[in-house]
Amino acid sequence: MEKKATRIVLASAIVAGAAAAPLAGAGAAVAQDAATGHASFAKCQACHAVGPGAKNKLGPELNGLADRQAGATAGYQYSPALKSAGFTWDQSTFADFMQNPRTKVPGNKMAFAGMRDQSEIASLWAYLSHFNADGSSK
C-alpha cells in the first residue's frame, strides 16, 4: 500500500510540475518583453516619464496606464480629442493607438508618428503595464 501511495504522490508532483512549466515560461517571456519594452521606451522618454517620481512632461506621465481612462492623468492638459475619446487603456487599445496615434484619436497632441512593429508595441505595453499609479512595480 505504501508503494502505491508513493507512486500516486510522485505522479501528482510530476503532473503539477508539468502544468506549472508553461506558466514559468510565460513569466520569463513577460519579463523579456518588459525588458525589450524598456529599451523601446527610449523613443518615448523625450515626452513621457514612468516609474517612481515620474512627472508630466510634454506628454503625460504613464504610471498606472493599464486600465486608466484615456485623457485622465491628473495635472496634464490633454487635447479635447483625447479627453473625450471615451476608452480605457488596455493592450489592444494601446496597440491600435501606437500604430498611428493621429488615426486612432484625430486631433490629439501626440506628435509621434507611431510604431509599425507589433512585437515592439506588445513589449512596450508589457513594460508600461508593470507600473502602478504611484510608479512602483507590480
Go through the PLM ranges and name each one.
Residues 43, 58, 106-108:
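Envelope-exposed proteins and targeting segments
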Residues 42-50, 124:
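The canonical Cys-X-X-Cys-His
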Residues 16-17, 90-138:
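C-terminal capping alpha-helices of c-type cytochrome domains
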Residues 15-28:
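C-terminal segment of classical bacterial N-terminal signal peptides
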Residues 32, 42, 86-89, 116-119:
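Residue-level signal for the nucleotide or nucleotide-sugar donor/cofactor binding architecture
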Residues 25-41, 51-52:
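Electrostatic cytochrome c docking/interface patches
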Residues 36-38, 52-91, 112:
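Gly/Gly-Pro-rich "capping" loops immediately C-terminal to redox-active cysteine motifs
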Residues 2-16:
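Bacterial N-terminal signal peptides that target proteins for export
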